[in-house]
A protein has these predicted regions:
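Hydrophobic faces of well-ordered beta-strands that scaffold small-molecule active sites
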Residues: 3-7, 40-42, 70-72, 97-101, ...
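Alpha-helical elements of Rossmann-like donor-binding domains used by nucleotide-donor carbohydrate transfer enzymes
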Residues: 27, 56-59, 86-89, 111, ...
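Active-site gating/metal-coordination segments in enzymes
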Residues: 39, 47-124, 170, 174
Length: 280
């Protein structure tokens, strides 16, 4: 199985570029089918109200009948004070299996990390080249898995990408994806130093061709076992923990796969940031 772990979808409302205007999937799906990609993780386009954008992605997930996974997009500043409830709805009602945060909106916060900890979700955080935050995240939230896309920099900041490789090597909960990584030598170095267990295949579709991005993985010349980890195994391992919450002792398993009970009384004690817990 091949899973593209990084593809945007739906409409934005910013009109400053494709990333916040529209991310149509028609051509992407054709390209993905031709490339042999089986499933895709959808992320909303940039939006001033992610509740709208996430709802559009959730609808696509339902209509796809299992073709799409989804990561709920969180705006660290606009959603402040309500993030626990947003994530609760995203997991329980909409079927999301991870959280997406972009530094373009605002820097990641404890509130986001605490929600990820409770629901055992991976966090895809685009640091836009400022990879030093990985050190703090690894220290403060060693039990939360973070995926830093683009090997740390979509803008090809080679210094940032080299620094991220160091974080991948040193921190068990730090991962990256291959979306838009143009320095193939650095991608090779990431696999060699950090190992194939820390890398996820992603395309940054629908704007980048998923077949072209996938070919980079094949060109790494890995064993079938290591290639499988990058193409699907690592992602499936990272989202498997969502089911552990679903099967927690005091929760009732939902009838819909991938969703967890609406009874969160047993989880609330895990939400450790006392500055925000009182609001829920």
């Amino acid at each position: 199985m091949i899973i593209d772990c990084h593809c945007h979808a739906g409409h934005g409302d910013g009109f400053t570029g494709p990333w916040d205007t529209n991310a149509p999937l028609k051509r992407y799906l054709k390209w993905a089918e031709e490339a042999g990609i089986d499933r895709t993780v959808l992320l909303a386009a940039f939006h001033s109200d992610y509740s709208v954008a996430n709802a559009e992605v959730a609808k696509m997930m339902v209509q796809s009948r299992g073709r799409f996974y989804g990561f709920v997009f969180i705006h660290a500043r606009h959603d402040q004070g309500n993030i626990f409830n947003i994530v609760k709805k995203a997991v329980n009602q909409q079927g999301f299996v991870g959280i997406k945060v972009h530094q373009h909106d605002a820097r990641i916060t404890r509130e986001i990390c605490e929600a990820a900890r409770v629901f055992k979700l991976p966090v895809l955080y685009d640091v836009t080249g400022e990879v030093s935050i990985c050190e703090l995240l690894a220290q403060e939230y060693p039990d939360v898995n973070f995926i830093i896309p683009h090997l740390g920099s979509f803008a090809d900041d080679w210094k940032a990408q080299l620094a991220l490789i160091d974080h991948l090597v040193r921190h068990p909960n730090m991962y990256t994806d291959t979306a838009g990584v143009r320095r193939f030598d650095l991608l090779e170095q990431a696999v060699q130093r950090a190992g194939p267990d820390k890398i996820l295949f992603g395309s940054d579709g629908p704007w980048l061709h998923p077949g072209v991005e996938l070919e980079k993985i094949f060109l790494l010349g890995l064993s079938a076992q290591d290639e499988k980890k990058i193409l699907s195994g690592n992602f499936l391992r990272l989202i498997k923990s969502v089911n552990q919450v679903q099967r927690s002792k005091n929760s009732v398993i939902s009838k819909k796969p991938g969703m967890i009970s609406s009874d969160y009384s047993s989880l609330r004690h895990e939400y450790r940031d006392r500055r925000v817990i009182g609001r829920y």
